Amino acid sequence: YLQGAGKINNVKLRGASVDLSYLQQDSAAYKYNNAKAQWQLLNHNNNGYLYGDGFNAVGTLHISGSLNKDLAVGITPRFAWDKDEHGDASLVEGYAKTHLGVWGITAGRQPMSWGVGRAGQLAFGSNATPQTAIKLNLLEPHTFDNGALKFLGKANVNVFASRLEGNRVASSGSALEKNHAAFVGVRVDIMPTDAFTFGLERMSMLKKFNKHWLLGDNADDAEKDNWNDIAGLDFKYRFPGVQVYASLYGEDQAHAFPCENAYNVGMYFPQLVPDGSWDLRVEGAKTNDAWYGHWVLKNGWTYKDAILGDWLGADAKRVYAEVNHYLADVGKLGLSY
């Protein structure tokens, strides 16, 4: 729509869903050791939504489309009911998107997930409430047609900026925290071939923007440490019949390079049978004890009491497997472990 294609002014209901669930656990939510966040059993990567005890009913509407050839909008309201809190309404996403030259510009709230992994993304996924942000992205990947960089093939760029909650000082109990700290990210995806994608990513919580952040010169003094970083790289390769992917990320920095590493690896088989009605995914992930915490920004790598990255948390390992059977015109049946 943003390039003038398609019908003008076609905002309409694109879909609706109802989620029925029942939750019974010892606590309403469990807490992490080194970050101010919480989690629930079997409820992850759900845009920060926590179920109430007992029966829950959640309905969502997906409305989107273009207002004209230069402006598209989207809104996803969510309506929930549980026996503890009764009725509740919230906004999963609400955004407007336009363009300037080769750049797409998005303003508003929209769920984003960067990196590879089905069970969770190490730096930034859909585990926490979506933030209101400004985002820039290339409308089409840039092609390196000739010259020394031709071997890179194509590249895409995504950049965003938002700010965190206004109660982070009070919730952490530390005067060194920062209310409404800036949260910024940049990701570059490089595609040397149609089968291979290589990604580079850096995300930062910023108390103050200065040259030291640009150079990666982190301070040893708590009074002068002004940011919390996660950065790293990932890749995906599409072989015939199987996709292989992995990522290696570092929590905070040492001498301009990420350290305190974590990783995930995975394999996806999109067609276990010739008709494509079955697929299989297997993943593994590991973090160390430094992940998602910070010695100055005590809330850690969180937003509204949820980890911004992988719900796995710090000092943890995970093995994940999922098999799905797709039913024609009905949906799918899945089993995960």
Functional labels for PLM-detected ranges:
Residues 50-51, 62, 140, 306-312:
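Extracellular/periplasm-exposed beta-strand and loop segments of Gram-negative cell-envelope proteins
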Residues 109-137:
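Long, hydrophobic, well-ordered secondary-structure blocks that form the structural core
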Residues 28-54, 58-74:
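Eukaryote-specific, low-hydrophobicity, charge-rich regions
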Residues 75-77, 98-100, 107-111, 118, ...:
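Glycine-rich, histidine-containing beta strand-loop boundary motifs that form or position
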Residues 61-63, 96-99, 103-106, 228-237:
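Structured alpha-helical segments in the cores of large, soluble enzyme domains
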Residues 51-55, 67-100, 115-126, 256-257:
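Surface-exposed loop and membrane-interface regions of Gram-negative outer-membrane beta-barrel proteins
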Residues 1-46:
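N-terminal periplasmic/intermembrane-space "pro-region" immediately following the signal or transit peptide
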Residues 70, 113, 133-305, 314-326, ...:
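Signature for the C-terminal beta-barrel architecture of outer-membrane proteins
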